[in-house]
């Protein structure tokens, strides 16, 4: 072991670095400090860039928030209003049958059959449609055809 105040050989200085005198410098100490300084500068620049980006985002967010909400209101209102919002009634009425097939309740038999064919092609159970919805479509067609005079 190296005694206090005595500089040990090179191999021993690495093993017992804590016993070196405070004034004695290791040859690789400058390289470590330069790397540490560079790392600290890089971290500082990264934090500054992040802060500027956050500041810019907060400034631009208020006007964008208003534009986004207005656009969402414009998109959702007209495009979704044409769809019927609600389930099926217990006993089907002519109005509901017309809504299901997409025709007027007073439409003729030819128009009802055409609408039924078009809707059933889209909702047929063999093509992945729901059997319940297909039954309601058929029920709507039967109801409208039995009450139509033409």
Swiss-Prot record:
Compartments, record wording: Mitochondrion inner membrane
InterPro entries noted in UniProt: DnaJ_domain (IPR001623), J_dom_sf (IPR036869)
Keywords in alphabetical order: Chaperone, Membrane, Mitochondrion, Mitochondrion inner membrane, Phosphoprotein, Protein transport, Translocation, Transmembrane, Transmembrane helix, Transport
Transmembrane segments: 35-57
GO molecular function: ATPase activator activity
Keyword Mitochondrion: yes
CDD domains: DnaJ
SMART domains: DnaJ
Chain ranges of the J domain: 96-150
Origin: domain of life: Eukaryota
Main localization category: mitochondrion
UniProt GO BP: cellular response to starvation; mitochondrial electron transport, NADH to ubiquinone; negative regulation of mitochondrial electron transport, NADH to ubiquinone; negative regulation of protein-containing complex assembly; protein import into mitochondrial matrix; protein-containing complex assembly; regulation of lipid metabolic process
UniProt topology in membrane: Single-pass membrane protein
Function: Negative regulator of the mitochondrial respiratory chain. Prevents mitochondrial hyperpolarization state and restricts mitochondrial generation of ATP. Acts as an import component of the TIM23 translocase complex. Stimulates the ATPase activity of HSPA9.
Subunit structure: Interacts with the TIM23 complex. Directly interacts with PAM16/MAGMAS; this interaction counteracts DNAJC15-dependent stimulation of HSPA9 ATPase activity. Associates with complex I of the mitochondrial electron transfer chain; this interaction may interfere with the formation of supercomplexes that facilitate the transfer of electrons between complexes.
Protein name listed in UniProt: DnaJ homolog subfamily C member 15
Classification lineage: Eukaryota, Metazoa, Chordata, Craniata, Vertebrata
